[in-house]
Amino acid sequence: MAGAKEIRSKIASVQNTQKITKAMEMVAASKMRKSQDRMAASRPYAETMRKVIGHLANGNLEYKHPYLEERDVKRVGYLVVSTDRGLCGGLNINLFKKLLADMKAWSDKGVQCELAMIGSKGVSFFNSVGGNVVSQVTGMGDNPSLSELIGPVKVMLQAYDEGRLDKLYIVSNKFINTMSQVPTITQLLPLPASEDDDLKRKAWDYLYEPDPKALLDTLLRRYVESQVYQGVVENLASEQAARMVAMKAATDNGGSLIKELQLVYNKARQASITQELTEIVSGAAAV
């Protein structure tokens, strides 16, 4: 019964792993709900900021801010939002594939790329495949704050202000629902004119106090910060949803594997009993 004992050991091992994946699934489900609440709370602010900035981009401003002007593109920057932990399916790798394809498209045009990383998985990936990482922040946990994101954002905005970057993008996963998270690359700077027909029909006329430059300097920076923060909280919700789904799949696969091993064990046990009976009958016949 040496084979049967080995199979029993494998079944026990899979059952223990199944308990772990089930617990991780339940933890991820709880964290996902909290992440969704944070995402829902920050969305109205981010969307309102986007609308206000969209009106500014479509309007005839007294002062043309550098963040609103298109430039000849020689260098582009990416703020890349990844996770700090794994076991979340293909969430990170799908995002990295999309980013690499976009970087290759720019590289084919002779444009250089710089990366600011948010999340340790992105740092590890681009350190291994090669990438010009100029800033990074990791270990933000499950409740990130805007102050933790200021470092990478400040580095990229300073590079844009000094003319070392001509475009700035944010790369993150957009949360659609529990089963669907979409990798997205969104242009932050220069601010793209809104494609929203409603914004084009309803032009707003602004009066600036004290002056357009001071107001736009503050407002446009706040806009970039709000979009980055929204990208981070949506990516966090996507991470927990992907982890919950991955752990559920692992738990279900564990159950299927246990059934298969149980069947193999039963066959091995049956073969052992049959062999013992054959030996007894043969011994009795010999007597």
Swiss-Prot record:
GO cellular component, one term: proton-transporting ATP synthase complex
Primary site of residence: membrane
Pfam family, any one: ATP-synt
Subcellular location: Cell inner membrane
Mode of membrane association: Peripheral membrane protein
Any Gene Ontology biological process: proton motive force-driven plasma membrane ATP synthesis
Keyword Transferase: no
Molecular function terms from GO: ATP binding; proton-transporting ATP synthase activity, rotational mechanism
PANTHER family per the UniProt record, alphabetical: ATP SYNTHASE GAMMA CHAIN (PTHR11693), ATP SYNTHASE SUBUNIT GAMMA, MITOCHONDRIAL (PTHR11693:SF22)
Assembly, per entry: F-type ATPases have 2 components, CF(1) - the catalytic core - and CF(0) - the membrane proton channel. CF(1) has five subunits: alpha(3), beta(3), gamma(1), delta(1), epsilon(1). CF(0) has three main subunits: a, b and c.
UniProt-recorded name of the protein: ATP synthase gamma chain
